[in-house]
Amino acid sequence: MAQQTFTGRKRVRKFFGHIREVAEMPNLIEVQKASYDQFLMVAEPPGGRPDEGLQAVFRSVFPISDFSNASMLEFVRYEFEPPKYDVDECRQRGMTYAAPLKVTLRLIVFDIDEETGARSVKDIKEQDVYMGDIPLMTMNGTFIVNGTERVIVSQMHRSPGVFFDHDKGKTHSSGKLLFAARIIPYRGSWLDIEFDAKDIVYARIDRRRKLPVTSLMFALGLDGEEILSTFYNKILYKRTKEGWRVPFDVNRFRGYSTVNDLIDADTGKVVLEAGKKLTVRAARQLQEKGLKALRMSDEELVGNYLAEDLVNPKTGEIYAEAGEEITDKTLKMLNEQGYKELPLLDIDHVNVGPYIRNTLNADKNMTREDALFDIYRVMRPGEPPTLDSAQNMFQSLFFDAERYDLSAVGRVKMNMRLDLDAPDTHRTLRKEDILAVIKTLVGLRDGKGEIDDIDHLGNRRVRSVGELMENQYRIGLLRMERAIKERMSSVDIDTVMPQDLINAKPAAAAVREFFGSSQLSQFMDQTNPLSEITHKRRLSALGPGGLTRERAGFEVRDVHPTHYGRICPIETPEGPNIGLINSLATFARVNKYGFVETPYRKVKEGRVTDEVVYLSAMEEGRYAVAQANVSLDAKGKFTDDLVVCRAGGTRDVVPMPADQVDYMDVSPKQLVSVAAALIPFLENDDANRALMGSNMQRQAVPLVRAEAPFVGTGMEGVVARDSGAAIAARRTGIIDQIDATRIVIRATEDLDPTKSGVDIYRLMKYQRSNQSTCINQRPLVKVGDHVKKGDIIADGPSTDLGELALGRNVLVAFMPWNGYNFEDSILLSERIVKEDVFTSIHIEEFEVMARDTKLGPEEITRDIPNVSEEALKNLDEAGIVYIGAEVRAGDILVGKITPKGESPMTPEEKLLRAIFGEKASDVRDTSLRVPPGVQGTIVEVRVFNRHGVDKDERALAIEREEIERLAKDRDDEQAILDRNVYGRLADLLDGRQGIAGPKGFKKDTKITRAVLEEYPKSQWWLFAAPNDKLMAEIEAMRKQYDESKKGLEQRFLDKVEKLQRGDELPPGVMKMVKVFVAVKRKIQPGDKMAGRHGNKGVVSKIVPIEDMPFLEDGTHADIVLNPLGVPSRMNVGQILETHLGWACAGLGKRIGETIDAYYQSQDLKPLRETLRKIYGEDETIKSLDDGELLELGRNLSHGVPIATPVFDGAKEADIEEMLKLAGFDASGQSTVYDGRTGDQFDRRVTVGYIYMLKLHHLVDDKIHARSIGPYSLVTQQPLGGKAQFGGQRFGEMEVWALEAYGAAYTLQEMLTVKSDDVAGRTKVYEAIVRGDDTFEAGIPESFNVLVKEMRSLGLNVDLHNSKLAAPPPAEAAE
């Protein structure tokens, strides 16, 4: 794989994959960006936006009319104004990054003619109205809400549409399957139609009391006969001399068991004897022989049902009603009346059951009115119905677009399931839909068709940010609509403007509530770039409108065949959320209907083409799909005649002839998620461990020096690029200027005369992430380097040369070591600590606010009562710590004093106070101190002042620095712009004939660079040449230059104005100071580490280097792991990685040796030869010049990086070959010596390089001690947990232990003075102060609580403290 990128030439990965990838992997955060863009539609012109997203919301709520229809408020268009603060400012100030929404509304006032009621337009007013702020998405697919970065997780929910299901025989004791159908709209009432145990069909609306389904049909306008004719065919029985003649139909008579002989009505022959069953084959044969009709006797008619009312034509008397069962009595009466033809219902109790007819029979309602009243009573119990209100209510339930919306998806799904052809735009229910659902349900009961699988991805869809936000905004607008209607009716409509009718608060509040407190709006996991990307690609089944943890059964959580290539079967949390929170697969995308699609290559006549098609789960069900690793020949034909495919609706794996294959996977990694695709040899790991591996990579802390893995999968670059951690060049160009905080590129392509030819990239330096890890970007380029569009020019946290680098490659030995690696513990070498291999920087943020209290304002100051000068040594005059100061637990960061409440003063005291001024005792020290367990360096201080409050010295100094930085930025940008523009101008004018110029220029002389240099640059614009096109270009350039210059200055002034303006602080806060402390955490015993294969452990001991086991060449192992951690866990991938990593390091060492030789001989041939042996004929390496080759060699000297993609990686033979190439034994094992004794270990040991991560479970964050601290108010027991500075819980079992030891006094102490004996605690303290060591325990407070609780239940409990009195003397017997 040739990687011709800027970073790809500096370090080339050897690629082991054999399968060529046809499809480009979609951008990994496309899910978020595309969805929100579709919602806002900023790019579309305001007048011509399509009807979706925000536009659709406004269209659905507007126009709003008042109650008398005398006026109407219409929506015209909306547009966004530029946001008030940019992303960085919002982060710093704790603001929300949002754009004000401006909506143009039109108010139309009508004149209404009182006699005719006709309306004529009286007045039209149009106005722009502010409708609140809409949060904007950052470049990386996140939102900034109140200064913190948040992600809106996409939700998986049941797709709208119709679903058929049964109860699996659980409802009724007989185990009979009860079928049910449910119509789920996007919003509106649910309609359930279900069978009961007696086979009567019922309908329920919104899970309320059930009604016979025929009542629903009556309400829809059908009568009894129509209902029967809709569901049953009519068969005409004709009277003949011998009996009744019945038309013979194969389908009707198949499976028919005869009681009497079956007789051909035309010939009178017996075609089937009594007591036999008519098979399908026999029935077909009879038809072929020409059997037209059968003869039936009278008794065989009994038990059938009439299809129509039988009426006396003269008198109108009804003899029998439609649906009535024929009995002997009825038959006798019909014969008497002389009926020659009987229309009967085609119900044979085998293929067609009498369910609807029975329901009709059981239904009490016989007319539409009765049915409507019944439905009204169910929906609104207790209200007396009128026909009008009942009709309106039924109409609004399913047929009113305001209240009921199937959505386009629901309509499409319904059409597909029921074979209907309603247009997508028809989003309410129709009569036909409901009848079709009932028909399909009855068909299921009759054994026709299949029930739906609700876990099929064709029946679950994804709601992403845009759609969630759309629903939220609609809720806000509907709340607003009510208020608008009321206001329109209550004001003088002729004089008001749209602005006066609208209060945008409900809409803004709905949005704020969604982003602030919705279950799906989550604090972004920003531990490392992978955790960011995974968080954005997450699919949750929880949240509003979704499932709950408790209700979700096993089926919903399980892996489904349709997840293939759409949802990762591996990555999901362990614990109660397992299977409810999933991750999108690498190549998956969400289509416009919200279904997850995955790409396949098309196969034509057994030949695989490069055409890529995205299929959703429903479409895929119709095709046979081969896997990506099926062997193909050079022309793309299958080499085998039978190809293993996933085929049919069940997606079973079956071999199929090559010419019947329809599609083929595009890549082996398309079935797993990003995190799982980063695990090399994933195919050799057990699924449970792979799950842990993919979850733990997200917890890896960015280290001080990132190092890409020797053994990667080729996904590392993609993740680093798409996560936004590493910076990619926006345009091709040359590096113009560079320092640690920014990179300036002069573009050489994509030059637009209207835009600046310079790109400036600002780097983030030592910023704090949401998880307190450190975000720091470092440039990778030098001045003069040429970069292409998309090349990585700066590394971010956990990236190395544009590749994701979550951990470090360390030399591991798999062997026991004195029990220190028992139970997955990890033994580390001191080298790891000394060389800062696993050192990370964490930035802690502390803030303090000075409020205006009732007793007076708090003050931030250096003048703190009762504090030594020593404690104030790090504070400046304003009382704020210096940047660069080293602080430890208990140090003051910001000095603050708070006024104290005091006892009322006597007049004398008041007089003395007035004369001698304030006394110091009325303030208390409430300074911000460093909490326990934190020790580090101050890296940043920010001071925020309320508007109108005087700034202190420190705030002014920070402001000056900031303004200087902005001015420098502006000047630099100006200089680059000048150099760029005047360079281009000189190129255009050079060698032209001058027809005009500045003062002193001779006309018609040639303009050269030398001539130009004589004049100041600002006068170059005065030169003119006789070429109109050229002059037009120069004029356009000048215009652009002036605009850019003006824009620069304006931007600078805006930013300075914002700086000086004062900050928006919470109410009551006068001033706020934020202090950032950088804490350096070295690895230490108790820290959690892990590999990428779910092999996790805790560091048990750090051993001096010389005591660690060493190899024959004297290299000491960095880490010793327990070999028993491998067999039972079945994650063999780690062993393969160890072998391959060792080969990589060995080859790196060889390259290092050739480079050392080069410095002696100045000959690069050996290096080229070595690289050719390792990489084969690699294009990238061939194209490097000597300098680049040397740089590549130096980068590879620690180890040669390789890529072994998942399911298509290095095989055993490849690993052995690599080991041999590196000069190692093919077994991957080595003789190892004991570092303490120097003796050789008996057996050879597996040694190699493994990629280890340090996880975000650091012992420093967990260790905690308390002597005195806060107590719970009610029980008076110490609080629990580190965050509350709580104590250790001495629980029930611990009490048993002390009881078992008989340690009575220790136990008494634990239960009283060390816990909740308030008086005893004080006494103990006093005793200690006195130097006395005796104390007495009292009554624990929790006992008093118990007594109080019992009293509250009406049980009087008294505790008598006196010693038990002697029993009263027994009275003498009389």
Curated annotation (Swiss-Prot):
Family: Belongs to the RNA polymerase beta chain family.
Official protein name in the record: DNA-directed RNA polymerase subunit beta
Organism annotation: Rhodopseudomonas palustris (strain TIE-1)
Top-level taxon of the source organism: Bacteria
Enzyme class of the recorded protein, top EC level: transferase
A GO biological process held by the record: DNA-templated transcription
Keyword set, alphabetical order: DNA-directed RNA polymerase, Nucleotidyltransferase, Transcription, Transferase
Enzyme Commission no: 2.7.7.6
Job of this protein: DNA-dependent RNA polymerase catalyzes the transcription of DNA into RNA using the four ribonucleoside triphosphates as substrates.
Enzymatic reactions: RNA(n) + a ribonucleoside 5'-triphosphate = RNA(n+1) + diphosphate
SUPFAM superfamilies named among the record's database cross-references: beta and beta-prime subunits of DNA dependent RNA-polymerase (SSF64484)
GO MF term set: DNA binding; DNA-directed RNA polymerase activity; ribonucleoside binding
Complexes and interactors: The RNAP catalytic core consists of 2 alpha, 1 beta, 1 beta' and 1 omega subunit. When a sigma factor is associated with the core the holoenzyme is formed, which can initiate transcription.
Pfam families in the cross-refs: RNA_pol_Rpb2_1 (PF04563), RNA_pol_Rpb2_2 (PF04561), RNA_pol_Rpb2_3 (PF04565), RNA_pol_Rpb2_45 (PF10385), RNA_pol_Rpb2_6 (PF00562), RNA_pol_Rpb2_7 (PF04560)
Gene behind this protein: rpoB
Entry's Gene Ontology cellular component terms: DNA-directed RNA polymerase complex
